[in-house]
Amino acid sequence: MEKNQRKKRSDAEYNQQIILTTMEDLLEQGEDISTKKMSDIAKISGVGVGTLYRHFESKTLLCQAIMDKKVDQMFIEIEDILAENTQWPVRDKINVILTKYLDLKEANFTTLNFIEKSSSHSSSVINIPFFERLKNLLIQQFENVHSIADLDFKLNLMLNAFSSDFYYFVKHNQKLTKQQFLDKLLDLYLK
């Protein structure tokens, strides 16, 4: 009996990995999986629809799972850079954090946009699962350095400037580069 349970768990882990790997491959090829039906995703992955739903109750959860490794890698890179550069001014540290986040956002724009918009009726960066982790990392940079009134409110406001809709507008309509966008934003909060 125990051997059967392990085999079932092994099969389940295998199926989950197949689904994630297939979707990651599609994303790398430029496919927008947010437009695909769950039945199509199951078919493309070579699993049954029931198997797909056992692992991921919704397309949003599937997209979040796809992003989990990428998000963790982003935070590892940020923490490594910050650890190596403890003497940097707060602005430089925050610039690195937000640059790394924008790198992730630009590389996975449609997926993060889908997560933002499907998490609630409002389109907000607050809806991304790692929002609090990102905000807490920013808060840490201010500890013992700057006293900013209403820091929590200001960071919520600042991070909402990273919503997919607004960032797309800034990049494509106002023609700002990533660094120009960050400089203008940081000037508002850190001058």
UniProtKB/Swiss-Prot annotation:
Highest taxon above the source species: Bacteria
Domain HTH tetR-type: residue ranges: 12-74
Keyword Transcription found: yes
Record-linked PROSITE patterns: HTH_TETR_2
Keywords annotated in UniProt: DNA-binding, Transcription, Transcription regulation
DNA-binding region: 37-56
Gene Ontology terms for molecular function: DNA binding
One family name in Pfam for this protein: TetR_N
UniProt xrefs under InterPro entries: Homeodomain-like_sf, HTH-type_Tx_Regulator, HTH_TetR
Organism encoding this protein: Staphylococcus aureus (strain MRSA252)
Protein name per the record: HTH-type transcriptional regulator SAR0097
Keyword Transcription regulation part of the UniProt annotation: yes
